[in-house]
């Protein structure tokens, strides 16, 4: 919130109509989904005159869709926000329902292929994609360690030993609790790389508490009982356009850098 945001942009506030002058003026910095949803809720309350400033030439932020060209077979691709589920994102789902943004089930799974090992998360046929893993003791031990690692969420999220969990890194925890290199290299590190596009060194240096909290919230510690992931029909640009349509004309000002 600001009364005088930036240089020449003060004119945007001075040009409010008579009805807006009776409302409290609010400036939202950034037209990503957080800024747009905040502006939408403020506008819906009918108590605020909202102006949104975005330094980029377009609104959306992390929700960025690269549209297909005219070539046959090409698809629109989301570069940032891609999927959500009905369990972890109740507020986002509520926003979609209010704006009548359509969504559909996504085909999403996890799989690993290394020089000697392959496995995936889609049922037993995926886990044992390589039949030789049925008699591979290292692979079976990895399954046991996945189940063991799943239980750490109860300790991390219980609130006990708060300082311990906040200081402990992923690498330290794995070493101190006897997890195998096979489990680390064929489960934990590939999962981190898939989610955050990070290298092994960075992943092992992650603080354990936020990592486990994120995995637990997204049901990534489960092997079979994972949520159904969904995607916005028409990609993320569709919900950005829906929010913009629900806001007053001209209240979102792109290409305006706030100092």
Residue ranges and their predicted role:
Residues 1-25:
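Eukaryotic N-terminal low-complexity, Ser/Thr- and Lys/Arg-rich leader segments
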Residues 21-52:
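N-terminal Rossmann-like FAD-binding beta1-loop-alpha1 element of flavoenzymes
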Residues 43-69:
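Glycine-rich FAD pyrophosphate-binding loop
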Residues 51, 104, 251-255:
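General small-molecule cofactor/ligand-binding pocket signal
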Residues 62, 208, 232, 236:
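Conserved donor sugar-nucleotide recognition element shared by glycan-biosynthetic enzymes
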Residues 65-92:
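N-terminal glycine-rich dinucleotide-binding loop that anchors FAD/FMN and/or NAD(P) in oxidoreductases
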Residues 86-213, 217:
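Mobile amphipathic helical/loop "lid" adjacent to a hydrophobic cofactor/ligand pocket
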Residues 213-259:
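Helical element adjacent to the flavin cofactor pocket in flavoenzyme catalytic cores
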């Amino acid at each position: 919130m600001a009364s005088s945001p930036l240089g020449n942009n003060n004119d945007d506030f001075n040009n409010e109509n008579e009805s807006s002058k009776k409302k409290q003026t609010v400036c939202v910095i950034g037209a990503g989904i957080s800024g747009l949803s905040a502006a939408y809720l403020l506008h819906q309350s009918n108590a605020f005159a909202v102006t949104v400033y975005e330094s980029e030439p377009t609104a959306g932020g992390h929700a960025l869709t690269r549209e297909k060209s005219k070539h046959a077979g090409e698809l629109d691709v989301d570069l940032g926000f891609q999927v959500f589920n009905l369990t972890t994102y109740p507020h986002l789902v509520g926003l979609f329902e209010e704006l009548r943004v359509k969504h559909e089930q996504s085909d999403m799974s996890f799989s690993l292929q290394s020089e000697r090992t392959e496995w995936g998360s889609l049922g037993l046929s995926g886990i044992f994609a390589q039949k030789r893993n049925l008699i591979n003791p290292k692979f079976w031990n990895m399954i046991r360690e996945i189940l063991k690692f799943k239980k750490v969420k109860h300790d991390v999220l219980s609130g006990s030993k708060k300082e311990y969990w906040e200081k402990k890194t992923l690498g330290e925890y794995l070493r101190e609790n006897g997890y195998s290199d096979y489990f680390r290299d064929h489960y934990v590190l590939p999962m981190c790389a898939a989610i955050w596009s990070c290298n092994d060194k960075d992943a092992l240096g992650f603080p354990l508490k936020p990592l486990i909290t994120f995995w637990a919230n997204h049901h990534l510690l489960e092997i079979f009982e994972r949520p159904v992931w969904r995607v916005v029909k028409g990609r993320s640009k569709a919900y950005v356009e829906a929010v913009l349509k629900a806001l007053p004309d001209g209240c979102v000002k792109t290409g305006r850098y706030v100092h």
